[in-house]
Regions:
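N-terminal subdomain of nucleotide-sugar transferases
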Residues: 1-53
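Conserved acidic donor-binding segment of nucleotide-sugar-dependent glycosyltransferases
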Residues: 315, 319-326, 334-339
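Nucleotide-activated donor-binding/catalytic signature segment of Leloir-type glycosyltransferases, i.e.
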Residues: 245-263
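Short hydrophobic beta-strand element within catalytic cores of glycosyltransferases
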Residues: 300-303, 320
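Nucleotide-sugar donor phosphate/pyrophosphate-binding loop at the beta->alpha transition
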Residues: 122-124, 131-151, 187
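Aromatic "clamp/platform" in nucleotide-sugar-dependent glycosyltransferases that forms part
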Residues: 283
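Carbohydrate-associated surface elements
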Residues: 164, 184
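Conserved donor-binding/catalytic core segment of Leloir-type glycosyltransferases
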Residues: 7, 195-212, 217-221, 234-236
Length: 374
């Protein structure tokens, strides 16, 4: 099959208002571009702008990326109308795609249904949203379920990023063909560490929202420090770092806990390569890129046994725990005392390379496109 024109659209995508939102979608698009011609179209509201529409058309990492900003209002129906119009205006500027690759079954992706109805362009949808996990079903509104059913019914394939999410979508009544295609890692950027840090270093990177439990990680580190002085914790990311700094100051822990702001991917890789153990202590997750990235640098992880995490972490590359602070303490102590034997960094990296590299994920998506377009 010759290279096909694939248009990525998404409910979430990095933009000037939310620079890291949906960055995993951008990485999927970059992977797909290894074997196809890819363009990206996104539309989002900006309440600060004067113009009804602004078109931000750029080449990002070799891919034409058009973000359409519409003037956001307090009227949700007007906002939705402007968003759909923004998508139509943006679509008119793009190459006609052979297939649309939509992301996240929220109302914006009704645009994929519109393109199918009007132009007979088939679409697949990658699903990342933890809202469809069983633990969150009670929060799903009837409107959200109705919209997602319309999108699912019209999709050629739904591609959840974890087996766990696929099972929960089936249990929600989803009848569309499904296949897991996981998140992707740039294994050339997230390369194996060359040496280990002098001081044992734990690392946590996230958006620091409550479900990631950054304060509980701090609390556990304070307790561990009462017994051990031979470690440090680096914690930060795209979130409220100042609140963490306040807690650290109040506990006089500045000497061994350091925070950092939002990082570039290169900086994330550098942090991981200069750490001994990554910590992800979330209440729920889907298939977190950050764990794959950590393993790709040869850094094992302590992570909660939720969502798709057990599909990534096992006793050879980390420790699975419940979201109990006592279990987090015990796991950190075991790792610090070197009482666990993980695979060597090359084996950890090769696991990611062989399953989640740009090339592997590009191949999985392209095989699905071929099946639909043959």
């Amino acid at each position: 099959m010759s290279k096909k024109n694939i248009l990525f659209i998404s409910s979430w995508f990095p933009n000037k208002i939310e620079p890291t939102n949906g960055n995993f979608v951008q990485r999927h698009a970059e992977a797909v571009s290894f074997k196809n011609e890819v363009e990206i179209l996104h539309c989002i509201g900006d309440s600060s702008q004067k113009n009804t529409y602004i078109f931000d058309d750029k080449i990002i990492n070799g891919i034409r990326t058009l973000v359409v900003y519409y003037q956001n209002t307090k009227n949700p129906l007007l906002n939705f109308s402007r968003r759909m119009t923004g998508y139509k205006k943006g679509f008119a500027k793009m190459k006609t795609p052979d297939l649309v690759h939509a992301n996240v079954m929220q109302k914006s992706m009704l645009f994929a249904v519109y393109l199918k109805m009007k132009y007979k362009i088939p679409f697949v949808i990658t699903e990342h949203w933890s809202g469809f996990l069983n633990i969150n079903w009670s929060k799903l509104s009837k409107v959200q379920l109705f919209i997602s059913k319309i999108i699912a019914k019209n999709a050629s394939y739904i591609l959840p990023v974890s087996q766990y999410l696929l099972s929960d979508l089936k249990n929600l009544g989803c009848k569309t063909k499904m296949k897991v295609v996981e998140n992707v890692v740039d294994t050339h950027l997230f390369k194996i560490k060359s040496e280990t840090p002098e001081i044992f270093t734990f690392l946590h990177i996230s958006n620091l929202i409550p479900l990631k439990n950054p304060e509980k990680i701090l609390k556990t580190a304070f307790k561990l420090r009462e017994k051990y002085s031979n470690f440090r914790l680096h914690i930060g990311g795209d979130g409220d770092v100042e609140n963490l700094n306040k807690i650290i100051r109040n506990n006089k822990a500045e000497s061994f806990i350091k925070t950092f702001p939002m990082l570039t991917l290169k900086e994330v890789s550098d942090k991981m390569r200069n750490s001994d153990c990554f910590i992800l202590f979330s209440d729920y997750e889907n298939f977190p890129c950050v764990l794959l990235e950590s393993l790709s640098t040869g850094t094992p992880a302590i992570a909660t046994k939720v969502g798709g995490i057990p599909e990534i972490i096992n006793k050879k590359n980390g420790i699975l725990i419940s979201n109990s602070e006592a279990e987090l303490y015990d796991a950190m102590e075991l790792v610090l005392q070197k009482k666990v034997n993980f695979d060597n960094p090359k084996i950890l990296h090769d696991f990611v390379e062989n399953h989640f590299s740009m090339e592997k994920i590009a191949e999985k998506f392209t095989n699905i496109y071929k099946e639909i377009l043959r």
